[in-house]
């Protein structure tokens, strides 16, 4: 296995561990999710270079689009929580109801 792939797998594991450990603040959870998506994106980009398939080269771009949508929704929810309650605790998510 290449050293780059091992580093990206370790980055994914570290981001997952960070998501499990620092889940009290919403901003920390969003940063860990972005780290996970970035490591998955790099792993998919490296693996599609090995396949030399033009159809498979589209998948990392689709993942990047979904990651951007996830980040936009997460940041808008963070702004809503911080404007309403003044903090970014995850426990305030239960209080948001339409």
From Swiss-Prot:
It is found in: Mitochondrion inner membrane. It holds the Pfam family Oxidored_q2. Keywords: Electron transport, Membrane, Mitochondrion, Mitochondrion inner membrane, NAD, Respiratory chain, Translocase, Transmembrane, Transmembrane helix, Transport, Ubiquinone. Its main location: mitochondrion. GO terms for cellular component: mitochondrial inner membrane; respiratory chain complex I. GO terms for biological process: ATP synthesis coupled electron transport. Core subunit of respiratory chain NADH dehydrogenase (Complex I) which is composed of 45 different subunits. Core subunit of the mitochondrial membrane respiratory chain NADH dehydrogenase (Complex I) which catalyzes electron transfer from NADH through the respiratory chain, using ubiquinone as an electron acceptor. Part of the enzyme membrane arm which is embedded in the lipid bilayer and involved in proton translocation. This is NADH-ubiquinone oxidoreductase chain 4L. It comes from Echinosorex gymnura. The gene is MT-ND4L.
């Amino acid at each position: 296995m290449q050293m780059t792939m091992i580093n990206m797998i370790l980055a994914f594991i570290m981001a997952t561990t960070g998501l499990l450990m620092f889940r009290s603040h919403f901003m920390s959870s969003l940063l860990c999710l972005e780290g996970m998506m970035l490591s998955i994106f790099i792993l998919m980009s490296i693996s599609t270079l090995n396949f030399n398939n033009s159809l498979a080269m589209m998948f990392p771009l689709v993942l990047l689009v979904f990651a951007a949508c996830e980040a936009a929704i997460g940041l808008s929810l963070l702004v809503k929580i911080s404007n309403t309650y003044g903090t970014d605790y995850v426990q305030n998510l239960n209080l948001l109801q339409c």
